[in-house]
Amino acid sequence: MSKMAEEKAAAVGGLGGAGAADAAQQQQLAAGEAAAARVRPVETLLRAAPLGLCVAAMTVMLRNQQSNEYGAVAYSDLGGFKYLVYANGLCAAYSLVSAFYTAVPRPATVSRSWLVFLLDQVFTYLILAAGAAAAELLYLAYNGDKEVTWSEACGVFGSFCRQARTSVAITFGTVLCFILLSLISSYRLFSAYEAPPSSALGSKGVEIAAYPR
């Protein structure tokens, strides 16, 4: 009988601990919601900023073409530049949607924080990859590659290279905005979780996983 009583007491204690943990998490979410209300206008503007940058970079690249006595070249002839246009278009759409999402007050939940965090990460890496690919193309256009006998092309198509360089520079400005947004969303997400107290580590009844050396 005493063993059954102990098991019941342990079960009740476990439920009480879980309830206390849930209450603490709800308090942290409420505090995070109050903080989010104060910074919501700033974050909304910050999320809208990449929209203008993406549209500018996309417009410059879409108009980028040149023809002379040596031939004709357009952005659509190069896969890296086409990827830059597509990535800027997608990021512009996400920037608009996320700005509206942030501007509308709504209760803070862990699931929403996870959603915004993951989307910020995806679009940050998307625009970063597009900028890096286009920058590599520009490097080859300006310097060539002697190992594969590629000659530089910007001496002949200077206007094309200058416009491409402008578009890539604007794209990296977008990258900086998305990195900052990723930091904000990651802070909001992980601040909702309470770290375990250090005094509980190694105490009686607590098992600590140890990895073999």
Curated annotation (Swiss-Prot):
Residues 1-41, 105-113, 188-213 are cytoplasmic. It comes from the Eukaryota. The keyword Transmembrane helix applies. Keywords: Cell membrane, Membrane, Transmembrane, Transmembrane helix. Its main location: membrane. The chain crosses the membrane at residues 42-62, 84-104, 114-134, 167-187. One of its GO terms (cellular component) is plasma membrane. Pfam families: CASP_dom. The keyword Cell membrane applies. Residues 63-83, 135-166 are extracellular. It is found in: Cell membrane. It is a multi-pass membrane protein. InterPro entries: CASP/CASPL, CASP_dom. Belongs to the Casparian strip membrane proteins (CASP) family. Homodimer and heterodimers. This is CASP-like protein 2A1. It comes from Zea mays.
